[in-house]
Regions:
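Core hydrophobic alpha-helical transmembrane segments of single-pass membrane proteins
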Residues: 12-13
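Boundary at the C-terminal end of the N-terminal hydrophobic targeting segment
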Residues: 19-24
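Sequence-level preference for short, compositionally simple segments enriched
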Residues: 25-323
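Bacterial N-terminal signal peptides that target proteins for export
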Residues: 1-8, 18
Length: 323
C-alpha cells in the first residue's frame, strides 16, 4: 500500500473552513465528526457540480473513519475522484446480503446488495476500503461497477461471496487488496489488475467472468500475488459464469492455495470448449503448468508481451490509466 499523501492533511484543513455552497468547487471534504463540509460520502457525491470534466474533476477528500452507508455514484456524476486519508482507516461499508428481504418483502438477490455502486463513467478512487460486512452468508457485494473507465488505486475490497461485480465497461486496479472466497471477482467487464494482492478466505473460486463472446478480454491479472487465509484453503483460479469467460494471469505469484488443475468448468463440460483461460510465468507452489486442465492455455512469451494495459483497456478512445 502506498503511504498517505502529505498533501491530504493540508487539503483537509483547508476544506474545514470552506462554505457549504459547492456550485463552483472541485474539492469537497468529508469527515464523520462534522468538522468539514459533509458527514457522509453520499452527501458529497450528491453535491458534485455539473461542471466536471477531464481537466476539472471533482475530488472528494475523505477523512479516516468507518462510514456505514450505501454509496452510489449516479450516472451523471462523471469525473469524480474519491480520495481516502488512509486505505486501512478510511472504510466505506454496509451489510446487505442476497437473502435479506427487500422493500417488496422478497429476498434482495445478488444485484441489490452492493455497499457501493458506481454507475458514472470516469470514476477514480484511492486509499479507501470498500467493504460488505455481511460475512459468509451468501452473495453480498462490496462494489458494483457499471460505469466505463473506472480506476482504483491502493484500495481494499473486503467481502466473502461476490465481493466485486464488474458488470460492464472497463476498469483498472493498481496496488489493491481483494478478499473473498466464492466468485469474488465476477462480471462481464474488461478489467486489468496490476500489482494486486488476491486473498482467498476459504475454499472457492477467485473469478467468475461472464465475458461476452465478441469481447477480446475479460479479467487480466499482471504481476499479482494470490494467498490463502490458512494452509488448508484450496481455490480455483476461476470458473466460467458464461461460456466465453476470459481470464488471464501474467507473472503472478501463487501460493499453495491454488488447486493444481487451476480451473473449474462450472459443472458444464461444454464450457471447456469456449472458455478463454490462460497463464504466463505463474510462480510459487500453486503454479504447476503440467497439472492444469488441458482446456486452459499456457501463453508464449510473445503472446504475453502483447497483453498490456493499453491493449486490454484502450478501446476506441485509447484509454490508458496506467500512464
Amino acid at each position: 500500500m502506498r503511504p498517505q499523501s502529505l498533501l491530504f492533511g493540508a487539503l483537509l484543513l483547508l476544506g474545514a473552513g470552506v462554505a457549504r455552497s459547492v456550485s463552483a468547487q472541485t474539492n469537497l471534504y468529508v469527515s464523520l465528526d462534522g468538522s468539514n463540509q459533509f458527514k457522509s460520502v453520499q452527501e458529497a457525491i450528491n453535491a458534485v457540480p455539473q461542471t466536471t470534466s477531464p481537466t476539472n474533476p471533482c475530488i472528494i477528500h475523505i477523512k479516516a473513519g468507518t462510514y456505514k452507508e450505501l454509496v452510489h455514484a449516479q450516472r451523471e456524476k462523471r469525473f469524480v475522484r474519491l480520495v481516502g486519508e488512509d486505505a486501512e482507516k478510511t472504510v466505506l461499508t454496509y451489510n446487505l446480503n442476497a437473502k435479506m428481504p427487500g422493500a417488496d418483502g422478497k429476498p434482495m438477490g445478488t444485484f441489490r446488495t452492493p455497499s457501493t455502486i458506481i454507475d458514472a463513467d470516469d470514476f477514480m478512487a484511492e486509499n479507501l476500503t470498500f467493504e460488505n460486512s455481511a460475512g459468509p452468508v451468501g452473495q453480498a457485494l462490496a462494489l458494483r461497477v457499471d460505469g466505463d473507465r473506472a480506476a482504483f488505486r491502493n484500495c481494499r475490497f473486503l467481502g466473502w461471496q461476490d465481493t466485486i461485480l464488474l458488470n460492464r465497461g472497463r476498469q483498472y486496479f493498481e496496488g489493491c487488496y481483494i478478499a473473498g472466497h466464492v466468485d469474488f471477482i465476477f462480471g462481464g467487464a474488461t478489467a486489468f489488475f496490476e500489482n494486486c494482492h488476491i486473498h482467498c478466505l476459504t475454499n472457492g473460486y477467485i473469478t467468475a467472468a461472464s465475458t461476452p463472446q465478441e469481447q477480446p478480454f475479460g479479467f487480466v491479472f499482471s504481476n499479482c500475488r494470490v494467498t490463502g487465509e490458512s494452509p488448508g484453503v484450496k481455490t480455483y483460479l476461476g470458473r466460467p459464469w458464461r461460456p466465453f469467460s476470459s481470464v488471464t494471469y501474467l507473472n503472478t505469484e501463487m501460493s499453495g492455495v491454488i488447486q493444481p488443475v487451476g480451473w473449474n468448468n462450472w459443472k458444464d463440460p461444454a464450457r471447456e470448449k469456449t472458455a478463454r483461460y490462460a497463464e504466463f510465468n505463474s510462480t510459487g507452489p500453486g503454479a504447476d503448468p503440467k497439472a492444469r486442465v488441458p482446456w486452459a492455455r499456457q501463453l508464449t512469451a510473445e503472446e504475453a508481451k502483447a497483453i498490456t494495459v493499453e491493449k486490454v483497456l484502450g478501446g476506441p478512445d485509447g484509454w490508458n490509466p496506467g500512464k
